[in-house]
Amino acid sequence: TFGWQVEAEQVSLLPDVLSSLSAIIAVHTREGSPIIVPTPAYMPFLEIPGRNGRDCVEVPSVHGTQDGSPRWMLDLDGVESAMAAGAGLLVLCNPWNPVGRVLDTAELDAVAALSSAYGVPVFVDEIHAPLVLDEHLSHVPYASRPGADPDLTFTATAASKGWNIPGLKCAQLIASGRAR
């Protein structure tokens, strides 16, 4: 559970994470509202907004360092600019596919603050949560952060990646508050 308590009534079942994203775009964003996707990204995240009548706004990551090592980082200024321009949703992947990085609590908290300030929902793909290989790191669910507004937070996950059972076709979409 990664220290995050989820009630059964907060969970909906869908075939996969991608259909969860399509459902959230269709139900919780305005027609034509842009969808923010930090890049690099899992390619279908860049295609699904267009299939749902929305523009995809790519926000390229920035290169930074942590403890002297290079790393990909979210461009929080770019995300904020896209939110201020009227974006309807931020798609976040944590751990970040394809860069394989676990987002730290400072980044998650910054995203939560932006989401709340602009009223922009966050769809978080956490399908890779069980695959953190660095023993010094651990996955922190975005929705578990104190600033993540439950009315603006959607978390998708599935056993398909961590346990290599994609044929099962059973993802979980977790939402609470008015997001349900």
Where do the protein language model's features map onto the residues?
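Active-site phosphate-binding strand-loop segment of PLP-dependent enzymes
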Residues: 62-137
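Active-site PLP attachment segment
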Residues: 144-180
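Substrate-binding/gating loop at the entrance of the active-site cleft, primarily
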Residues: 15-26, 37-56
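Aromatic/hydrophobic pocket-lining residues that form π-stacking "cages" and hydrophobic walls in ligand
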Residues: 45, 111, 142
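A short helix->loop->beta-strand "cap" motif at the edges of active sites that frequently abuts
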Residues: 33, 54, 117-121, 126, ...
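Phosphate-binding glycine-rich loop
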Residues: 1-34, 177
